[in-house]
Amino acid sequence: QTAPVPKAISK
């Protein structure tokens, strides 16, 4: 499972 940049969701 590859998430679409979890960092962007965190911000």
From Swiss-Prot:
The keyword Nucleotide-binding does not apply. Keywords: Amidation, Pyrrolidone carboxylic acid, Secreted. It comes from Batozonellus maculifrons. It is found in: Secreted. Expressed by the venom gland. The modification Lysine amide is found at residue 11. Is a minor component of B.maculifrons venom. The modification Pyrrolidone carboxylic acid is found at residue 1. The keyword Zinc-finger does not apply. This is Peptide Bm-10.
